[in-house]
């Protein structure tokens, strides 16, 4: 994904949230909702923050350093927070459901690509080293290359010292907001997807 139509992403994400709102008891997004760019992207990129919801107003901010492949899913994830979802795992779930339902290939790909690190992490914890390495070989070389380039891109922007402080503080913040697993909550989206697939057969 070399470029992304941000206006089309906004249209598709809102449309799909309207589609799933009733099924998951979500608030439908208002037409006026739109993301704002971060004021200090260099600082946010330095700590690995892709987006966040502002604490004082119902608005969400996206990092202008986002790669095109990351933009649709991050847009949908942050919109989930605006719609009242506090859990990071649930925001990931709704971000995935919304983007993966899109008729736009780039938006669909963004959904699956965004969950790849969480799938890798879960697989690494569940499989033996041999099984994990065998499973990794099923991932296409193109996806592996894109993933490695994404990791290198953000590592180049990351500030280890500030990043470690932010990670610790954010972990405390999540736990203080009734998310006991803290930052690990993000990867719990895999369990949510498996549970949804088992109950509905949709995934």
Language-model segments: residues:
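Auxiliary, metal-adjacent structural segments of Zn-dependent hydrolase domains
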Residues: 1-60, 64, 68
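Polar alpha-helical coiled-coil and adjacent low-complexity
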Residues: 107-116, 135, 188-193, 201-202
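Membrane-proximal, solvent-exposed terminal domains/tails of membrane-associated proteins
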Residues: 89-93, 105-112, 141-145
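Short helix/loop segments within enzyme catalytic domains
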Residues: 96-128
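Amphipathic alpha-helical blocks and their helix-capping loop/short-beta junctions
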Residues: 122-150
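Pan-zinc metallopeptidase signature
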Residues: 142-203
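Soluble non-cytosolic domains of exported or imported proteins
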Residues: 4-7, 11, 65-70, 82-89, ...
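Active-site recognition of the HExxH zinc-binding catalytic motif
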Residues: 73-92, 96-97
């Amino acid at each position: 994904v070399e470029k992304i139509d941000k206006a089309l992403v906004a249209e598709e994400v809102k449309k799909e949230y309207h589609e799933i709102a009733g099924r998951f008891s979500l608030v439908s997004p208002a037409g006026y909702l739109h993301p704002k760019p971060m004021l200090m992207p260099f600082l946010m990129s330095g700590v690995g923050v892709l987006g966040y919801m502002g604490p004082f107003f119902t608005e969400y901010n996206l990092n202008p350093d986002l790669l095109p492949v990351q933009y649709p899913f991050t847009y949908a994830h942050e919109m989930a927070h605006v719609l009242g979802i506090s859990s990071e795992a649930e925001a990931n779930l709704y971000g995935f459901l919304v983007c993966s339902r899109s008729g736009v290939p780039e938006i669909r790909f963004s959904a699956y690509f965004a969950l790849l690190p969480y799938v890798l992490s879960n697989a690494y914890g569940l499989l033996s080293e041999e099984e994990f390495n065998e499973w990794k070989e099923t991932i296409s070389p193109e996806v592996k290359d894109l993933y490695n380039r994404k990791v290198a891109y953000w590592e180049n922007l990351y500030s280890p010292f500030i990043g470690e402080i932010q990670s610790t503080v954010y972990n405390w913040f999540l736990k203080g907001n009734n998310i006991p697993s803290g930052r690990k909550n993000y990867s719990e989206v895999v369990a949510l997807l498996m549970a949804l697939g088992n109950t509905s057969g949709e995934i």
